[in-house]
Design a protein with these regions (language model features):
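Active-site phosphate/pyrophosphate-handling residues
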Residues: 95, 118, 153
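Acidic, divalent-metal-coordinating active-site segment for phosphoryl/phosphodiester hydrolysis
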Residues: 147-160
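Short, acidic/small-residue loops that bind anionic groups at enzyme active sites
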Residues: 108-116, 120
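Conserved non-catalytic scaffold segment of RNase H-like nuclease domains
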Residues: 1-111, 125-128, 132-146
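Short Asp/Glu-rich motifs
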Residues: 72, 120, 154-155
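Acidic two-metal-ion nuclease catalytic site recognized across multiple nuclease folds
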Residues: 1, 157-184
């Protein structure tokens, strides 16, 4: 594993089911630089709730010809490789990933992850720790909230700044990291 490298990940779902991924965005960060991005719409093969559409703006017709998760997942894993994954509110995103992998009948990969929301709560003094509020805390421009690629970029920028308070990324993953396999 490269010393200071990680992948920031974000999902949007079509409805309340954790298996209804309709968009995925990821950014790879190596030595404090975003080096690669990954973004795709995903056909959830499920209904869209009006509540979720209001959040992310993705309509059923937007994903009609999009690949399904079983097609996208191998490309996601190739992008992630052996890097740790970070998500802002990882409890949601990692449950989405875990349940979607189970739904397509594949084994859960050995994947280390941590949560930038929880790391922020342990690291900085802010009145709120949501993605938008942390971007404001660090005085960073933030446009397109609930667009998976923009949210993954925001998560990466926040994480990079939070990591400056620690010895290195390995230290953070050893203390706060979890493994997707443990969701069992």
């Amino acid at each position: 594993m490269i010393q200071d490298a990680f992948v920031a990940l974000d999902f949007e779902t079509a409805n309340g089911k954790r298996t209804s991924i309709c968009s995925v965005g990821m950014v790879k960060v190596i030595d404090s630089q975003i080096t690669e991005t990954f973004h795709t719409l995903v056909n959830p093969q499920d209904y869209f709730s009006q509540q979720n559409i209001k959040v992310h703006g993705i309509q059923p017709e937007d994903v009609e010809n999009a690949p399904t998760f079983d097609y996208v997942f191998p490309y996601m894993m190739q992008f992630i490789a052996d890097l740790p994954v970070v998500a802002h509110n990882a409890a949601f995103d990692m449950n989405v990933l875990h349940q979607s992998i189970q739904n397509i009948g594949l084994p859960t990969p050995n994947l280390t992850y941590f949560c930038s929301y929880q790391l922020a709560k342990r690291t900085v003094d802010s009145y709120r720790y949501g993605l938008k509020h942390m971007m404001e805390f660090y005085q960073l421009d933030f446009h397109g909230h609930h667009d998976t690629l923009n949210d993954a970029k925001a998560c990466a920028m926040i994480t990079f700044r939070l990591l400056k308070n620690y010895e290195n990324l390995t230290y953070v993953t050893n203390i706060y990291g979890k493994n997707l396999k443990d969701k069992g």
